Amino acid sequence: MDFKQYSPEELKECSMIEVVHSVLGDKKQATTFNELVQEIAQVLGLSQEQVNAKIAQFYTDLNIDGRFINLGENRWGLRSWYPYEQIDEEILPQPKPKKKRKVEEDGFDDYIEEDEDDFDDVDGNEDEDDDVEDLDKVLEDEDGDDDDLDDLDDDEDDFAEEELEYDETEEEEEEEL
């Protein structure tokens, strides 16, 4: 679209999105956002202050408008230039093929099931027997502690009975006096 044929009044009525669509249509190639903003400012005769005031809304409109596509690295193009299948290819970075390495022998590939069974069937493990004996001793000691508690309870009961007997004998002696 040739913007020279329009009067300045007609250009002021054009939106920034319409101008960008025309600019990209004329160029027929993707352009960076900054270049698009500079061309819009030149075509519409906008000052830097006016551009700074409108740039956020322009970027939002550019994203929302379905006619434009962001190709990455801040480059914009017309969606009509890219068939749907090609969009992913253009936008996504292409993976680099990886070099194949020689497989090194590490010795871990030879797994023998017999080795695993040997660990379960080990006889004569004296450490385990010692541990069981130690546990038995601990349990016996704890049982002994319970016996001590029972003895204490019995002692308390005996003391209480003796105290009652003492109190009774004391009362009898007082009555005799």
Curated annotation (Swiss-Prot):
Acidic residues bias: start-end ranges: 106-177
A single MF term (Gene Ontology): DNA-directed RNA polymerase activity
GO cellular component entries: DNA-directed RNA polymerase complex
Annotated region (Disordered), positions in chain: 93-177
GO biological process, one term: regulation of DNA-templated transcription
Keyword entries, A-Z: DNA-directed RNA polymerase, Nucleotidyltransferase, Transcription, Transferase
Residues covered by the HTH HARE-type domain: 14-81
InterPro entries, alphabetized: Asxl_HARE-HTH, RNAP_delta_N_dom_sf, RpoE
Keyword Nucleotidyltransferase set for record: yes
Classification via Pfam families: HARE-HTH
Similarity section: Belongs to the RpoE family.
Described purpose of this protein according to its UniProt entry: Participates in both the initiation and recycling phases of transcription. In the presence of the delta subunit, RNAP displays an increased specificity of transcription, a decreased affinity for nucleic acids, and an increased efficiency of RNA synthesis because of enhanced recycling.
HAMAP family: RNApol_bact_RpoE
Subunit architecture: RNAP is composed of a core of 2 alpha, a beta and a beta' subunits. The core is associated with a delta subunit and one of several sigma factors.
UniProt-recorded name of the protein: Probable DNA-directed RNA polymerase subunit delta
Record organism: Bacillus cereus (strain AH187)
Gene name linked to the record: rpoE
